[in-house]
From Swiss-Prot:
Catalytic activity: citrate = D-threo-isocitrate
Protein name: Cytoplasmic aconitate hydratase
Sites where the protein binds substrate: Q86, D205, S206, H207, R536, R541, R699, S779, R780
Post-translational modification Phosphothreonine, affected residues: T628
GO cellular component, one term: mitochondrion
Similarity comment: Belongs to the aconitase/IPM isomerase family.
GO molecular function: 3 iron, 4 sulfur cluster binding; 4 iron, 4 sulfur cluster binding; aconitate hydratase activity; iron-responsive element binding; iron-sulfur cluster binding; metal ion binding; mRNA regulatory element binding translation repressor activity; RNA binding
Enzyme class: lyase
Annotated source species: Homo sapiens
Length: 889
């Protein structure tokens, strides 16, 4: 079918008649000029891809009519221009692609039809761990270990980059996916197949939203959805409401972009923006650099929105020049965006579009702050940190409480480290990490940290040797300007040597703490602290031994490392004493904004970006040396413990089976609120007494070789055993934190996997009960694949985080939702009952279904298949089955 909007296409420049764009102004529809800029991107993609099958004329009308349709839960398709993947989520995607080729061949189709149809960039950044720190060779040693542990995965990925068209792999040691995307991969405007169109993307990482700071619409999706986009399917999404976030004023000179984003995160969590876009506007936006905007956009998942969009303006174009982008491309980017009404002047209120709701922040009201101890939205002003931590100590166990009895608040434990005696207490800092693309992409906070380090060293201050300090920049550019500006030696002197280019501590790859420190924490039952410049601090994520974790700007990470404790009031208490015996306060070493900007102007230059990124695909010698086969079908090695052909397609036939009711299911787990994808499918270390450890031990591996769950996502046997294996999982059956459950028929307490296996052997279906925000956190496809492999047919929850719900759908697991005002407690459910879920043949999106218990009780729940497309996926047993059937025909 030809595109019914073909008449809108015209050359952007008469000199180049072969290069066209869809001129949305030719719609002559007054509604277009009132649309939020983010919605204009959705509209352009729909018009350009309209084929009356995947994208229909009615979809375009629905988007144009956004003012009304935003309130009606209407689904629209979106075909992003490209996909980005990181290696933890990318390995299972390439495994699925390889297995799909096998399945298509088995069903008589052409396996080479399975290929990405849009550009897919995979950045290897999740594998490196902080094994070595505080030594000059930390970087080399950590990279060597990364290769030793991950050689097999890396060989597989290198095979994928050669076997599949349109797939580029950025080797390990290059940087963090979102920073590499911002500084290098981002196009802003595509020039492809004779058309100009806005750059847009989805990524298999929830912080993909960082790119929204540059005016490129993008967000995180599950690996399963990303694979569908790579195969040419549009994403099906509810047309979102758009919250206009007006920024006014100018930030105080001592305030960092981190303080601004933590303030916005708390504010938007209170406003309630889950499932909505946030679009920034107002004169305050013009005060923010692209790095500042990217920091704010990066933490979008923490405030719960789908996207956090800053339309392109002059500052964006300046950033493209600063980062050494191609001058030829810069010529058409601005011209195209102006031609389609997508170029913004934040000082011109006449350009402000309509929004669902407007909220605002005066930047001058922002104060220096941190967030914690267990959630990114729990902002605490730095001036209140001591008081707040001390109130958390005694408060009831929860997001702001550790339930330490008052008589134990001043407990401490001495220990020997490096032949010297030290003391740990509640609030002692044991991890201080400058980490994560959230902040290392921002030269002002990184140079701020460097200048603070210089002043601290000059004042004779230091960091206790037992504190695990690290610096893991998101790209080589950071190290370049830290060295050129002369601050790197001072960072090293305080223990902040570069330990690797990757996510590291931010995703829990913080590596081991010194044994004496762990013993002191455990024996003293102390609430030890991690301070990091990351974006998430959920319990158990950063390190198992840091029960409190605070997000802070890079300069504050160093300040708390020097203090050695979170229990300090920087205004009244000194950081230490200098050689002359004088007290040194934080205000004495804090650099001014003018100092930072002067250094930034001098040392952050386009040549740096060009030099680093020119050689990005060839700079890693170990990667270059990897030998891989050139076959188009992958040869699965049965001895491999990293890469295994998944069982998802084993019994797949071309014919569809009608949907079946779930009869007499047992409850595997009875969970509460805010169960994250980290709880469901942890990414961190594999505990020695876990089912996954037993499996790997039986395959001849020693604990040293276990690596992490995240690195083993290409092996379903490990990942199924790692499902619900988080030591912080709180199962209401047990009333304690443990990766265990009660096997109801026998009453035995078992590891979750062992219980599920027993149910499966008896042919008994399973469900999970949960509370609000089920599946919050990372866009982890194994949090849906794992439960599927455990035999879980449905989850019954009060509400779902967006990405996780769509991942469950993509695996054919039913996301059921209680009716408003109902939950397990209100309905008197204990989880000991058996559940029958009646599934009718004539399914419709968001249909209410009957749930019957063996106690005789019945109630209704909503099946959260939100669109016809999602229903189609479910009826096929998941999105990949649907694609295989389509390709095999």
């Amino acid at each position: 079918m030809s595109n019914p909007f073909a008449h809108l296409a015209e050359p952007l420049d008469p000199v180049q008649p072969g290069k066209k764009f869809f001129n949305l102004n030719k719609l002559e529809d007054s509604r277009y000029g009132r649309l939020p800029f983010s919605i204009r991107v959705l509209l352009e993609a729909a018009i350009r891809n309209c084929d009356e099958f995947l994208v229909k004329k009615q979809d375009i009308e629905n988007i144009l009519h956004w003012n009304v349709t935003q309130h009606k839960n209407i689904e629209v398709p979106f075909k992003p221009a490209r996909v980005i993947l990181q290696d933890f989520t990318g390995v299972p995607a390439v495994v699925d692609f390889a297995a799909m080729r096998d399945a298509v061949k088995k069903l008589g189709g052409d396996p080479e039809k399975i290929n990405p149809v849009c550009p897919a960039d995979l950045v290897i950044d999740h594998s490196i761990q902080v094994d070595f720190n505080r030594r000059a060779d930390s970087l080399q040693k950590n990279q060597d270990l990364e290769f030793e542990r991950n050689r097999e995965r890396f060989e597989f990925l290198k095979w994928g980059s050669q076997a599949f068209h349109n797939m580029r792999i950025i080797p390990p040691g290059s940087g963090i996916i979102h920073q590499v995307n911002l500084e290098y991969l981002a196009r802003v405007v595509f020039d492809q197949d004779g058309y100009y169109y806005p750059d847009s993307l989805v990524g298999t990482d929830s912080h993909t939203t960082m790119i929204d700071g540059l005016g490129i619409l993008g967000w995180g999706v599950g690996g399963i959805e990303a694979e569908a986009v790579m195969l040419g399917q549009p994403i099906s999404m509810v047309l979102p409401q758009v919250i206009g976030y007006r920024l006014m004023g100018k930030p105080h000179p001592l305030v960092t972009s981190t303080d601004i984003v933590l303030t916005i995160t708390k504010h938007l969590r209170q406003v309630g923006v889950v499932g909505k876009f946030v679009e920034f506007f107002g004169p305050g936006v013009a005060q923010l650099s692209i790095a500042d905007r990217a920091t704010i956009a990066n933490m979008c998942p923490e405030y719960g929105a789908t996207a956090a969009f800053f339309p392109v303006d002059e500052v964006s174009i300046t950033y493209l020049v600063q980062t050494g982008r191609d001058e030829e491309k810069l010529k058409y980017i601005k011209k195209y965006l102006q031609a389609v009404g997508m170029f913004r002047d934040f000082n011109d209120p006449s350009q402000d579009p309509d929004f669902t709701q407007v909220v605002e922040l005066d930047l001058k009201t922002v104060v220096p702050c941190c967030s914690g101890p267990k959630r990114p939205q729990d902002k605490v002003a730095v001036s209140d940190m001591k008081k707040d931590f001390e109130s958390c100590l005694g408060a009831k166990q929860g997001f702001k409480g550790f339930q330490v009895a008052p008589e134990h608040h001043n407990d401490h434990k001495t220990f020997i480290y490096d032949n010297t005696e030290f003391t740990l207490a509640h609030g002692s800092v044991v991890i201080a990490a400058i980490t994560s693309c959230t902040n290392t992409s921002n030269p002002s906070v990184m140079l701020g940290a460097g200048l603070l380090a210089k002043k601290a060293v000059d004042a004779g201050l230091n960091v206790m040797p037992y504190i695990k300090t690290s610096l893991s920049p998101g790209s080589g550019v950071v190290t370049y300007y830290l060295q050129e500006s002369g601050v790197m030696p001072y960072l090293s002197q305080l223990g902040f040597d570069v330990v690797g280019y990757g996510c590291m501590t931010c995703i829990g790859n913080s590596g081991p703490l010194p044994e004496p420190v762990v013993e002191a924490i455990t024996q003293g039952d102390l609430v030890a602290v991690g301070v990091l410049s990351g974006n998430r601090n959920f319990e158990g994520r950063v390190h198992p031994n840091t029960r409190a974790n605070y997000l802070a700007s890079p300069p504050l990470v160093i300040a708390y490392a020097i203090a050695g404790t979170i229990r300090i009031d920087f205004e009244k208490e000194p950081l230490g004493v200098n050689a002359k015996g004088q007290q040194v306060f934080l205000k004495d070493i804090w650099p001014t904004r003018d100092e930072i900007q002067a250094v930034e102007r001098q040392y952050v230059i386009p040549g740096m970006f060009k030099e680093v990124y020119q050689k990005i695909e060839t700079v890693n010698e170990s990667w270059n040396a990897l030998a891989t086969p050139s076959d188009k079908l992958f040869f699965w090695n049965s001895k491999s413990t990293y890469i295994k052909s998944p069982p998802f397609f084993e019994n797949l036939t071309l014919d569809l089976q009608p949907p079946k009711s779930i009869v007499d299911a047992y409850v595997l787990l009875n969970l509460g609120d805010s169960v994250t994808t980290d709880h469901i499918s942890p990414a961190g270390n594999i505990a020695r007494n876990s089912p996954a450890a037993r499996y790997l031990t039986n395959r001849g591996l020693t604990p040293r070789e276990f690596n992490s769950y995240g690195s083993r996502r290409g092996n379903d046997a490990v990942m199924a055993r790692g499902t619900f294996a988080n030591i912080r999982l709180l199962n209401r059956f047990l009333n304690k934190q443990a990766p265990q459950t009660i096997h109801l028929p026998s009453g035995e307490i078992l590891d979750v996997f062992d219980a599920a296996e027993r149910y499966q052997q008896a042919g008994l279906p399973l469900i999970v009960l949960a509370g609000k925000e089920y599946g919050a956190g990372s866009s982890r496809d194994w949090a849906a694949k794992g439960p599927f492999l455990l035999g879980i047919k449905a989850v019954l929850a009060e509400s779902y985080e967006r990405i996780h719900r769509s991942n469950l759908v993509g695996m054919g697991v039913i996301p059921l939702e209680y009716l408003p005002g109902e939950n397990a407690d209100a309905l008197g459910l204990t989880g000991q009952e058996r559940y029958t879920i009646i599934i009718p043949e004539n399914l419709k999106p968001q249909m209410k279904v009957q749930v019957k218990l063996d106690t005789g009780k019945t109630f209704q729940a909503v099946m959260r298949f939100d669109t016809d497309v999602e229903l189609t996926y479910f009826l096929n047993g998941g999105i990949l089955n649907y694609m295989i059937r389509k390709m095999a025909k």
